[in-house]
Amino acid sequence: MANLKAIRDRIKSVRNTRKITEAMRLVAAAKVRRAQEQVLSTRPFADRLAQVLAGLQQRLQFENVDLPLLQRREVKTVALLVVSGDRGLCGGYNSNVIRRAEQRARELSAQGLDYKFVIVGRKAGQYFQRREQPIEATYSGLEQIPTAQEANDIADQLLSLFLSGTVDRVELVYTKFLSLVASNPVVQTLLPLDPQGLASSDDEIFRLTTRGGSFTVEREKLTSEVAPLPRDMIFEQDPAQILSALLPLYLSNQLLRALQEAAASELAARMTAMNSASDNANALVGQLTLVYNKARQAAITQELLEVVAGAEALNG
């Protein structure tokens, strides 16, 4: 009977764990939807900013203007901005982006370049601190759905490093959101800004929906027509000064989009991990229930045999 009680307690424990993992899966799904809504809400501003930048670029394309954020110089030191999470229970999300950052650092070292880390997320920060890697700044405790203010703070730090000459290039290592079961750590150059990429406004948006009782992601390719500014438009300020003032805003916007996509990747990884944990809990409950029934059947059979044996002994 003691063995039966232990099995019952184990079944109860697994069922309670399953309730927790299922709740975490649903919470992650709700936050993915919030991240999706935030991306859509910021899109009109991003489109308008791209339109203005494209127009200013066209206006200044034949002029020799000095814009530090577009200036390319000899690269000696690279800042690696690594975006990870603050928490675990999200499968291989954190380990994959950390592995990609380490790989990029080795590539830079092989080229004879120095590197410094700027870390977003407690997991990557703890990892690189333990290995005594050169860390310029760390950011943790950010909102699970990144805000514009957080992106601005990080962008200001990157601008300071680049404009002061501390680093000659800034690269972003983050997880690109592909689907609920797939993500891809990528490396993207943030600074210097690419003049050819400022007018690019092609984008993909994702929508988390339910189909057949399970979650799925629908992706939609969006292409915004960037209308040129009127040729007779008169600027109160020098167009070069306006462009110089808008470029940091463009950087912050690009960084915010990357943070949002990384957050969606983390939440999707957590959804997948918790879904897998719930499935494993269901399978374990089934196995334990079978073991319990067999043990209970064996105990009942043993009791019957003892009763029969006792009756035969009395009759004999």
From Swiss-Prot:
PROSITE patterns: ATPASE_GAMMA (PS00153). CDD domains: F1-ATPase_gamma. The keyword Membrane applies. It is a peripheral membrane protein. Keywords: ATP synthesis, CF(1), Hydrogen ion transport, Ion transport, Membrane, Thylakoid, Transport. Pfam families: ATP-synt (PF00231). SUPFAM superfamilies: ATP synthase (F1-ATPase), gamma subunit (SSF52943). Its main location: membrane. GO terms for cellular component: plasma membrane-derived thylakoid membrane; proton-transporting ATP synthase complex. InterPro entries: ATP_synth_F1_ATPase_gsu (IPR035968), ATP_synth_F1_gsu (IPR000131), ATP_synth_F1_gsu_CS (IPR023632). It is found in: Cellular thylakoid membrane. GO terms for molecular function: ATP binding; proton-transporting ATP synthase activity, rotational mechanism. The keyword Membrane applies. Belongs to the ATPase gamma chain family. NCBIfam families: ATPsyn_F1gamma (TIGR01146), PRK05621.1-2 (NF004145). F-type ATPases have 2 components, CF(1) - the catalytic core - and CF(0) - the membrane proton channel. CF(1) has five subunits: alpha(3), beta(3), gamma(1), delta(1), epsilon(1). CF(0) has three main subunits: a, b and c. Produces ATP from ADP in the presence of a proton gradient across the membrane. The gamma chain is believed to be important in regulating ATPase activity and the flow of protons through the CF(0) complex. This is ATP synthase gamma chain.
